[in-house]
Every structure is written in structure tokens, then in C-alpha cells.
Amino acid sequence: VPSFFPDGFGTYPVIAAKVNNVSQGLKYRAFNSRQVEFLDYTSYVGRSVYCSSLCFLLCKAAKDLFPECRIVLRRPISKGYFCSLDKGDGTQIAQADIDAISARMREIVDEDMLFRRHEVRTEEAIEMFRELGYADKVSLLETSGDVYVNYYTLDGTPDYYYEALVPSTGCLKVWSLGLYREGMLLRVPNRHKPEELAPFVEQPKTFEVFSENLKWNSIMGLDNVGDVNKACRRGEASDLIKIAEALQEKKIVQIAEEIDCRVRAENPVKIVLITGPSSSGKSTFCKRLSIQLKACGLKPISFSTDDY
């Protein structure tokens, strides 16, 4: 490929490609005319490919050191990914464990191991992951509806990822792993400066919201997408929506009550700001909050600042 691009692809190394607008690994084989766009880390898809590959690297290193462990990539937070690790021996994760996992990850990066892509019948993949004890992947694949599925192996360790991965571990040079709360935080590169780590940003409220969400998902038996798919197949979609709406309404009531207390305080609150990206539900939330504030005896005036 470099012979077709003697001047290079850009400032940063290419790690994936879009083929007819679908992300593919660099080992994807095209047998006829295709529209190809090469991607580096600064692109949204390129960053996603890098981070997925990095997560696989972390899982591989943890399994090498703690064969009975269960590692769960919980949520993106603080410019990284929060992960929980159950070592299988009943002990809490410690800094020594983090150091050992980091060292093993560096060894794998230095060895430049290949991420190998495999295509098999979905039934074969389900049976393989069931034997490995990956219940979440089994649940997801059982409800995918696909006849064939792609999975990846790293030095013989299999895992399932929906999107493409980088060609080899040698591409994953920038990252950091540290102890964070009751788990660990996998930090990733800055999207605009891939040679540097993204700056750490403490997000305690976001972390609390994610933790509460996981708690409620567990209570409802929805630990992964496969569980949601199965619930929908059982005709429970309407109930799930109603429960989610009830939980949100409960939160809005709590917010309204807190605002009411602050309005009646010695230094009263006079304005409440609601922020969020386009089409995220700000106006709807504003109307629902206004109703609850009126129920508290207040007379809120709502208006949109982006309605020019």
C-alpha cells in the first residue's frame, strides 16, 4: 500500500480504514473496486479502533497473570476507561497488581503480537465462549441473529469485538494504567495529540451516575446488551421503558426538591441552567422539571437560550 502513497498518509500512523464507509482492519481484503479512507487516531473511528484494541490488550495481560480473574470494562470516565477486576481469590486489587498488569502489557506491546481475525459460524463462537465462561458474550451472540460472526485472538486468547482492531500490539504504545476507586483506570491518548495521554479529569458526579445505573441494570437483570435483547424477545420492552421512565421521574422529583430548598434558603437560587448537546432532551427535561417545581409551590419561568 505505501507504494501508492509515496508521500505518506499524514502526520500519524494509519491504524484502520473505512471501506465503503464501514470500518475495517488493515488486513481486510478487497476483491473489487472499493472506496477506501485510511484512518489514524485523530479520527473518531480510528480512536475507537485503538481503544478497543487497548482493552483487548488489558484483558490479555490480566488473564496471563490471573487465569481465574474476571475483568469488566465498565464505562468511559475521566478521559479513560474504568475497569473492575475480580482476581478470583477473594482479595482486592492493589497497586502491586496494577504494576504487574502494566508490565505484562508492555511486554506484549514490545513483542508486537498480531491481532488475528477469525470468521466462524455463530454457533461455534457461542460454544467456544461458553466453555471459556464468557456469559455476556454468549448472551450477546445468541441474540445477534447473524449466521456468521467475527472474533479476534491475541496469542491464542480469543475475544469478541464488533469493530476492527489494529494490526498488532506494537501500535499500542501510548496508554497508562492506574488504581482508581475500587478498580483501575485505563487512560488513552489525546485524540488531537496521540503521542500524549489525554489529561485526567476527575468526574465524581458522572462516576456516581454510572455506578447507580449499573446497580439498577443489575436489579432488573440487564447486565449487557444480550440481556436487553432477550427481555425484548419475551415481550418485556414496554415494562423496561416504563421502569426507566419511573426512575427518571424519581430523579427529577429529587432535583426539584433540592432546588426548592435552595430557593427558600438565606441566599436563594434564582436561575437553573440545563446544558447538553443538540437533541439530547433538554427542552423535554426542562418541561418535566418545571412541572415538579410547580408541585413544590414554585412558579418557574422556562425559556430556551438557543432559540434565537
Where would I find each of the regions flagged by the language model?
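Active/ligand-binding-proximal structured segments within catalytic/core domains
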Residues: 2-6, 47-65
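P-loop (Walker A) phosphate-binding loop of NTP-binding proteins
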Residues: 277
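Hydrophobic positions on the alpha1 helix immediately C-terminal to the Walker A/P-loop
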Residues: 284-285, 289
